[in-house]
């Protein structure tokens, strides 16, 4: 018989994972609250990258259904930079990133927050642009407003996603249903872990022309 994971057990496991994660400098500064499998993180961290690391660590704990990341980024004095310096570094980082249409992406910086705008053909290009700037010193957050242009018909998108799900060793494809509306993909069905749910979403995003994925897959633990 499977052991029932209570919210108290889940909170302890998340706290233990945060303490174990080397990318988190001060785990004691992070508050963890759990209700019905939903984890809320509060408190502060020293960088945007650390904020994302904490979120990923919490999501990786068995039994976690979702994470609300309310962590505040408080930059130490040594990491504080002007918006002009951040913009210069961000522009250079984008210049060095392979596979993205650099001339189609614009950026702005306000109080340490980097905003990305423009158009790309593939979702991975949108992600790559964000990955290029989010770890830069002084960055408090990234607002990714880059749009993915639809490139193929919805029937082709659905077919490609169905085939990709079947190829994935991590998933039971027969448990997942794919619906397409224009360039939007809706995923339904059941999986046994958050990682499987995220993997199905990742697969869907790989299809050309996808601009939105609504992941309604239910995690059954």
Q: Which sequence ranges carry the predicted segments?
A:
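N-terminal targeting leaders
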Residues: 1-221
């Amino acid at each position: 018989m499977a052991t029932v994971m209570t919210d108290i057990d889940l909170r302890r496991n998340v706290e233990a994972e945060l303490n174990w994660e080397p990318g988190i400098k001060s785990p004691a500064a992070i508050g963890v609250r759990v209700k019905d499998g939903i984890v809320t993180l509060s408190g502060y961290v020293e960088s945007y990258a650390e904020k994302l690391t904490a979120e990923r660590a919490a999501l990786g704990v068995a039994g976690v259904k979702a994470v609300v990341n309310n962590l505040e980024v408080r930059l130490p004095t040594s990491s504080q930079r002007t918006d002009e310096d951040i913009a210069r570094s961000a522009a250079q980082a984008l210049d060095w990133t392979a596979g993205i249409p650099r001339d189609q992406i614009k950026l702005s910086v306000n109080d340490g927050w980097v905003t990305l705008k423009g158009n790309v053909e593939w979702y991975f290009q949108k992600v790559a642009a964000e990955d290029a700037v989010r770890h830069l010193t002084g960055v408090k957050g990234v607002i990714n407003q880059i749009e993915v242009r639809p490139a193929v018909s919805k029937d082709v998108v659905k077919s490609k996603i169905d085939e990709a799900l079947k190829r994935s060793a991590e998933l039971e494809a027969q448990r997942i249903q794919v619906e397409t509306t224009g360039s939007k993909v809706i995923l339904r069905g059941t999986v046994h872990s958050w990682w499987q749910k995220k993997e199905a979403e990742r697969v869907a995003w790989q299809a050309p022309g996808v601009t939105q994925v609504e992941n309604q897959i239910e995690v059954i633990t």
